[in-house]
Design a protein with these regions (language model features):
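Lipid interaction determinants
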Residues: 1-46, 52-163, 169-221
Length: 221
């Protein structure tokens, strides 16, 4: 799903926002990502999703700061002709800010693949001496993908995200076309990725970055 608009209420003040945001639900998991003007930072979350008494219960397991636990959000969802409307009451942000949000979402695709799901990076083979402590969460579903990366680059912590469209054939040859990212130069790029399912809970992907082949192994979350 791609967001069509969002209304935020804070301390009685109502603000309308338009932003590039994606949300993927698949196989009992969720992930969303966008550049958040409210907190002036990236805003990414992923975790478990399940229906309970007519509401979607989202339990985050990771966000842009890293692994998280102890949170649960009841998300009221109303189906629409083009997607759904989502209401979250009492969303807490850094500094104790409490926001109420109403989001309107449009369905982007119903495509499926064998790689659909929420994945956590296990190993990374790369000749990048300036990068360490590299962690990644990746979601694939509905013909789209999202990735969240946390790492240390040249001694400084960095956190980035990207999302776009995803196509893969029966041989595992995938094309990822970037739509939005916290890295401006990444937007609009088209990446060829070789993917292989090792079993139902693990896959590898390889791609060329700065002339070097990067190979990564993921485990299903």
């Amino acid at each position: 799903y791609l967001i069509a608009g969002v209304t935020v209420t804070e301390n009685g003040e109502v603000t309308q926002y338009s932003r590039d945001q994606i949300k993927i639900y698949t196989q009992g998991r969720f992930m969303y990502a966008f550049n958040n003007a409210v907190i002036e930072s990236i805003d990414v979350g992923a975790g478990d999703a399940s229906w309970s008494n007519g509401v979607m219960v989202e339990v985050p397991r990771v966000n842009h700061h890293g692994p998280v636990s102890g949170y649960s959000f009841d998300v009221a969802i109303d189906q629409t002709e083009t997607g759904f409307e989502q209401t979250v009451i009492g969303m807490e942000y850094e500094g104790g800010r409490l926001l109420d949000m109403v989001e309107v979402w449009d369905k982007a695709s119903t495509a499926t693949s064998a790689f659909d799901g929420l994945w956590q990076l296990q190993t990374r083979e790369s000749n990048e001496p300036n990068i360490s402590e590299f962690a990644e969460t990746k979601m694939i579903g509905g013909g789209h993908y999202i990735w969240l990366q946390n790492a240390v680059f040249e001694g400084e912590p960095v956190k980035e995200f990207g999302f776009g469209t995803f196509e893969v054939d029966a041989n595992g040859d995938a094309i990822e076309t970037a739509m939005t990212s916290s890295i401006p130069d990444y937007e609009g790029t088209v990446s060829a990725v070789k993917m292989e399912l090792l079993d139902k809970n693990h896959f590898t992907q390889s791609f060329v970055y700065n002339g070097e082949t990067v190979t990564q192994t993921y485990m299903r979350m």
